A protein has these predicted regions:
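Long recognition/docking surfaces used for binding and targeting
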Residues: 1-7
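Signature of N6-adenine DNA methyltransferases within the class I
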Residues: 8-32, 45-70, 77-252
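Sterically constrained small-residue positions within well-ordered secondary structures
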Residues: 35, 178-180, 322-323, 348
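Proline-centric
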Residues: 35, 80-81, 128-132, 193, ...
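Polybasic, glycine- and aromatic-enriched phosphate-binding surface used to engage nucleic acids
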Residues: 229-351
């Protein structure tokens, strides 16, 4: 999300293709306070220079010449040689789905630990890790979901191997970006720091941008489990992986079309099941089966789904299947404000 000192993004910013979103001054100030190192500084997606204007002598890189500030290098960040090294890398990397990343950037970003499920901001993180000198710091604002995203598992393992996230500010539901999703986090990573000690702050519903001037810090332990990054209050000798494994549910990409009491052929545990205990009757399509009659009128919409490549031979299939097993399980409603997101249910199908 390339940066600027304004809050409202103008219409000429390329949000979908380039991930261009303005960085509010309160965010910039908070992130600048996390800088500890002296030495060479890089802002890899500098936009109009929200950070760069406070960092004399820093190298700024911006792919869009319309917004590059004076002195910035107008280039694709992934063209920067890995032989470069920086004491501090700071900024707001672009949030772009893989399918929307330009072909040129895709080619340049090949050969990383990531794959075609990864958002562009994850490729930025991976590239920055290679550019950090020993003891170097990476200070970013990103979606917080990388901590537990399946697409980020190899990157998270690499980060944990290389160092520690020394500061992490969960911004909660603060709407700091116009026309952009909340659920972001500000964090600082230090290469070579293996203390596993993290200063952690979580902003609540009543907090405002002013809270960033003095975050409510607490001490946490930085852990990695199954490629997921955690900030825990204690060390836990028993890991979830010792007694269970985690699987994610199916994704249709069009629940309103696949949900049908009349044409459905399988009951699914869904996000509302935790509240009412009810399952959802849905149209399930096994690979190799012909398209269900109920979906034929919706072919044009279904083939245009972007969760995976669709053609004339598979347009009726779900975007992602689910692990089929009769093993006992505990369901977790992953995106909820419920204090108790865990529940059990006899149904073994889940989305």
């Amino acid at each position: 999300m390339p940066s600027s000192s304004a809050i409202v993004a103008p219409s000429d910013y390329e949000v979908a293709a380039l991930g261009q979103v303005f960085t509010p001054p309160a965010i910039v100030d908070c992130m600048r306070k996390l800088v500890r190192n002296t030495g060479r500084v890089l802002e890899p997606a500098c936009g109009d220079g929200a950070f760069l204007q406070h960092l004399p002598g820093a190298l700024g890189i911006e792919i869009d010449p319309r917004h590059a500030p004076p002195g910035a290098e107008v280039m694709n960040f992934f063209e920067l040689s890995d032989d470069e090294a920086f004491a501090t890398i700071i900024g707001n990397p672009p949030y772009v789905r893989y399918q929307d990343i330009s072909p040129g950037t895709r080619r340049l970003a090949r050969g990383t630990v990531l794959d075609k499920r990864a958002n562009l901001y994850l490729f930025f993180i991976e590239k920055c890790l290679r550019l950090l000198e020993p003891g170097g710091e990476l200070i970013f604002i990103t979606p917080r979901d990388f901590l537990k995203a399946t697409s980020a598992v190899p990157l998270n393992r690499l980060m944990f191997e290389l160092g520690t996230i020394t500061e992490f500010i969960d911004l909660g539901d603060l709407h700091l970006f116009d026309d952009a999703t909340p659920n972001c986090a500000i964090w600082r990573f230090e290469r070579g720091n293996l203390t596993r000690q993290t200063r952690y702050a979580a902003l609540g519903f009543a907090d405002t941008a002013e809270t960033l001037a003095a975050p409510p810090w607490g001490e946490r332990r930085f852990l990695e489990s199954g490629g997921h990054l955690l900030f825990t209050r204690h060390d836990y000798p028993l890991r979830l992986s010792d007694i269970a494994f985690v699987k994610v549910g199916a994704v249709s990409g069009a629940d309103d079309l696949y949900t049908s009491d009349a044409a459905g052929n399988r009951d699914f545990v869904c996000s509302s099941t935790v509240a009412d205990g009810l399952t959802r009757r849905m149209i399930w399509c096994e690979p190799g089966e012909p398209p269900p009659e109920a979906l034929l009128p919706h072919k044009e919409r279904l083939i245009s789904r972007r969760i995976k490549p669709y053609t004339e031979t598979n347009w009726w299939l779900w975007g992602r299947g689910y692990y089929v097993s009769d093993l006992p399980r505990v369901y977790v409603n992953g995106k909820t404000r419920r204090a108790q997101p865990f529940f059990v249910h006899d149904c073994t199908n889940y989305d």
